[in-house]
Amino acid sequence: ALGVKLLSSGDLTSDTTRSVPSASLACAARLDDEALILFTSGTTGVPKGVVHTHRSLRARWLGLRQSLGIACFRRTLCLLPTHFGHGLICNSLFPWLFGQDLIIASAFSPNLLLRPGAIIDEQNITFLSSVPSMWGLSLKGSKPPQGKTLQRIHCGSAPLSAHLWRQIQQWAGIREVYNAYGITE
């Protein structure tokens, strides 16, 4: 339905990775080396560049696992672009690194935002993370999911009003809708 091959962490141990010389798999990076720079205005609206080390990314993922567990991330849907920190770090890499299924939308388009309810049902999604502007379109054009697989929604990267938060809860039919603050806050 999304035109995307489902890739699980188990795929990394397939024959395709056995042909890669083991020396090239070695990581020379140290925990305190810079891993990436996120340029963002985030929830606060103040532009900035935020440097993350391998240690800070690891701490984020381990903190998420400790505080939220991984069960609700069993089938994660990423509607966000993966070049976007929110889409990459917490919405994609976190569930995937801990062995959960990750469904990534092939290309972002406004039409995609008119289908989240259907996608949740078709793919048995348990978790998705999003941004408030996404919900502006989705709540107007998407029917709510009919199945009962969805367990948790995060919404962040921009201010989330109490009114929109309640609308998302009603649309999804769950109470577990959280205003998430990212690693650039």
Question: Which positions does each model-derived feature cover?
Answer:
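Conserved AMP-binding A3 loop
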Residues: 35-62
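Structural detector for helix-capping/boundary residues
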Residues: 32, 54-55, 123, 175
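Conserved pre-ATP/AMP-binding loop-to-beta segment of ANL
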Residues: 20-39, 46, 69-75
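Conserved AMP-binding/adenylation subdomain of ANL enzymes
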Residues: 58-75, 85-126
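Gly/Ser/Thr-rich phosphate-binding loop
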Residues: 125-130, 139-185
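ANL superfamily adenylate-forming
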Residues: 1-32, 153
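Short beta-strand->loop structural element characteristic of the AMP-binding/adenylate-forming
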Residues: 1-11, 48-51, 78, 100-108, ...
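Conserved S/T- and glycine-rich ATP-binding loop of Class I adenylate-forming
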Residues: 34, 40-43, 76, 82, ...
